[in-house]
Amino acid sequence: MSCTVAIPSSPVFSPSRRPLSCKAASASASPESVSVAASSPAQAAPPAGSPLRPFALRAHLREEATPSPQPSAAAAAAVSAPAGSVLKRRRPAPLVVPVCGGAAAAAAAAAVAAVESDPRNEVEEDGEEFAVYCRRGKGRRRVEMEDRHVAKVALGGDPKVAFFGVFDGHGGKSAAEFVAENMPKFMAEEMCKVDGGDSGETEQAVKRCYLKTDEEFLKREESGGACCVTALLQKGGLVVSNAGDCRAVLSRAGKAEALTSDHRASREDERERIENLGGFVVNYRGTWRVQGSLAVSRGIGDAHLKQWVVSDPDTTTLGVDSQCEFLILASDGLWDKVENQEAVDIARPLYISNDKASRMTACRRLVETAVTRGSTDDISIVIIQLQQFSR
């Protein structure tokens, strides 16, 4: 018969003398935070007479020989923190955003200064038959003057042939600049081919000039485009053409007569033409736009919209008689703020005096009127004295 004897002081039957107490964090602390504290009185070794004394001694020696792992920084902080305290997460280091250096600021200032000091920001040009005044707009987004003009008297060496134009660039100045530099040359070449031809041949020559100018600009693979309005005077005849929303207005005995119609996406016939070509016109923020992008429906350039924004001009031909006083060519910066008849009324008292200073004053006054009414666009105006080119 076996017999079991319980020894009260033996660790085999005695509960551990090393209780753990788990204290919940305070109500204000994070629910994820728990404070653990150990009541760690040193565990007494078995008494010398205990039969477990040799085993306890060997276990004690093994604990001393095994190095304890180094606690992490967070664990060390937890151990060093008072019992019952709540550990807080450390705030991350502040994010420092670098400020542009002096070189970058200086470069930006130099770029602005270059734009502001560009001599094309305000241009005056006059002759015996014409006056030109151009001014850069003051819109917030306006970076550089995008308008250009041309005034060529004695085109191709003929004193009775003259060519004038206003070119309103968009998406940069490159297209308008190219047109102003090259269209007069292309026009002279085309007019040589129809020397002595009738009005129909002349209109076809002007159309070929526009198409060639567009073709040559597209070869450069540059962005942007330009609206155009031109006037060709020869042998007592006037040929006015446009592609875009630059406009030509004739003063006929003091009555305004528009010789062009603006090519805008809002025009019903232009919208129908674009849709027949597979495009679309949409009203975006109150303005009708081709493919939701461009407000004009014709012009030079605009390669990404070339399928719909064509360079074919509309052309009007008429004879210069005694009632034809002067012709105003201007970009939409003027016409958006000044009506046709109003422009004639402002310019006529000054222009019919046949004085250079008065003609330039007429151009300036038209620009000032538009600016006073809120125009922030570039404005270019050419006024031509037509009687100088009558038969």
Swiss-Prot record:
CDD domains linked to this entry = PP2Cc
Enzyme superclass (EC) = hydrolase
Residues that span the membrane, as ranges: 95-115
Biological process terms in GO annotation: abscisic acid-activated signaling pathway
A single MF term (Gene Ontology): metal ion binding
Q: What membrane topology was assigned to this protein in its record?
A: Single-pass membrane protein
| Cofactor(s) in the UniProt record | Mg(2+); Mn(2+)
Annotated stretches, region: Disordered:
1-53
Task: Cite the binding residues for Mn(2+) 2.
Answer: D168, D332, D377
Cellular compartments annotated = Membrane
Keyword Glycoprotein: yes or no? no
Q: How is the cofactor bound?
A: Binds 2 magnesium or manganese ions per subunit.
Q: Reaction catalysed?
A: O-phospho-L-seryl-[protein] + H2O = L-seryl-[protein] + phosphate; O-phospho-L-threonyl-[protein] + H2O = L-threonyl-[protein] + phosphate
Q: What is its EC number?
A: 3.1.3.16
Q: Does the keyword Transmembrane apply?
A: yes
Q: What does the entry list as the binding residues for Mn(2+) 1?
A: D168, G169
Residue ranges of every copy of the PPM-type phosphatase domain listed in the record: 129-386
What InterPro entries is this protein classified in?
Answer: PP2C, PP2C_BS, PPM-type-like_dom_sf, PPM-type_phosphatase-like_dom
Q: Per the record, where are the segments of Low complexity compositional bias?
A: 8-51
User: According to its record, what are the GO cellular component terms?
Assistant: membrane
The protein's UniProt keywords, in alphabetical order, are: Hydrolase, Magnesium, Manganese, Membrane, Metal-binding, Protein phosphatase, Transmembrane, Transmembrane helix
Q: What family classification does the UniProt entry report for this protein?
A: Belongs to the PP2C family.
Q: Which PANTHER family match?
A: PROTEIN PHOSPHATASE
The protein depicted here goes by the name Probable protein phosphatase 2C 32
Organism field: Oryza sativa subsp. japonica (Rice)
